[in-house]
């Protein structure tokens, strides 16, 4: 009797993808573990790479075919997800008025990227919104947990509020008018 052992099939047992850290970057990676089959395994990725693991990837879909010496195959597809673009939205801004010094404010919202966010204003503040501002230009440096960063500039203007002064410029010979139509 002759015993013929069938070779084990090629299997991809683990796929670990690391998404890109910042919008527009190419620092994603895919690590796989393949085994089985006969002889050495070869790797063919949809982006042309021929190694088991691939790196320096931008967002998108990547397909892999693993082939053994007998041309038996296993395949898998993995996605590197995009990261929303980091942005700053100005919600409201109040200019400084002459009625009260240092009463300007800037209220913003951070969007995109990967939170939590870090705020660094040119006046030393580290909060999302700032207040008690004098007329000046303020720069916000915003970064996310992956150290992706952007900056934006906001200007607080000085608004002169008219001051109403009431002066009585009429001379009534020391008397005030008592009734409409009277000539006192």
Model-found features: residue ranges?
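Proline- and Ser/Thr-rich low-complexity, intrinsically disordered segments
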Residues: 1-184
